Amino acid sequence: MTNRQWETLREYDEIKYEFYEGIAKVTINRPEVRNAFTPKTVAEMIDAFSRARDDQNVSVIVLTGEGDLAFCSGGDQKKRGHGGYVGEDQIPRLNVLDLQRLIRIIPKPVIAMVKGYAVGGGNVLNVVCDLTIAADNAIFGQTGPKVGSFDAGYGSGYLARIVGHKKAREIWYLCRQYNAQEALDMGLVNTVVPLEKVEDETVQWCKEIMKHSPTALRFLKAAMNADTDGLAGLQQMAGDATLLYYTTDEAKEGRDAFKEKRDPDFDQFPKFP
């Protein structure tokens, strides 16, 4: 594996947020519990992803887990209380749902770099990422029905779009675990590489993506998400279109005419069939 010098962009307690040549990397840093997340972990990830979204130097975002044994094993069951996962404020919550939506709407590609276990809510995080590079030691699966939990959102509905309804029901009803090759065969990941090469491969994919039009990638992500995200997905795509429209001379003519208190001259712009 190439020895890269990742730059720390911000210090957190339960995650790492680093940068390397246009790539932001968010790492769940709780290896002692297989990178299970708490409300604080999720809040920190939301903050880091929001910063990556706004950072003009960031083109692609990588989500991973600390160490080689786990990407993420889902919510920390020791923090689960009455009504949700209890944080330092003693309020039960499921803020991981906010994180899932954020990953979906960020107008930049998000790649899951999976080493070891991606189970439970960890597999759902894998599911909502745009692409997945899996190490050959990766293990995938859902655990909810075993521990009195479930994900009736992206973790089931969108999972079924990816692997098919029959396979998704198998994953949830049986709570089995699947190795990296099995995950590749069902379309849950994009590629499988040796553990020692997983970061090299992920960075290579990032660099290939970064050669392409960020506006085109933004619209492609929004278009593919709109199919499964309903009106929220359409809203995101419409917002992306509006931002692009604002950069055109046609939009600027309307704005300038209003500011200059005159009628806009829209006849000068083409009306393509």
Swiss-Prot record:
Record keyword Lyase present: yes
Cofactor(s) for this protein?
A: hydrogencarbonate
What name does the UniProt record give this protein? Answer: 1,4-dihydroxy-2-naphthoyl-CoA synthase
Cofactor binding summary note: The hydrogencarbonate anion plays the same catalytic role (proton acceptor) as the side-chain carboxylate group of the essential 'Asp-185' found in actinobacteria, archaea, bacteroidetes, and deltaproteobacteria.
- What residues does hydrogencarbonate bind to? 142-144
Supply the gene name.
menB
Q: Name one GO cellular component term.
A: cytosol
> Key word Membrane present in the record?
no
Q: Which residues cross the membrane?
A: none
A Pfam family found in this protein is ECH_1
Recorded GO MF terms? 1,4-dihydroxy-2-naphthoyl-CoA synthase activity
UniProt-listed HAMAP family: MenB
- From which lineage does this chain's organism come? Bacteria, Bacillati, Bacillota, Bacilli, Bacillales
Q: Where is the composition biased (Basic and acidic residues)?
A: 254-265
Region of interest: Disordered: 254-273
Q: Which reaction(s) does its UniProt entry say it catalyses?
A: 2-succinylbenzoyl-CoA + H(+) = 1,4-dihydroxy-2-naphthoyl-CoA + H2O
Assembly, per entry: Homodimer. Can also form trimers and higher oligomers.
Q: In which pathway does it act?
A: Quinol/quinone metabolism; 1,4-dihydroxy-2-naphthoate biosynthesis; 1,4-dihydroxy-2-naphthoate from chorismate: step 6/7; Quinol/quinone metabolism; menaquinone biosynthesis
Site (Important for catalysis): give the residues. Answer: 85, 246
User: Family assignment?
Assistant: Belongs to the enoyl-CoA hydratase/isomerase family. MenB subfamily.
Q: Which NCBIfam families match?
A: menB, PRK07396.1
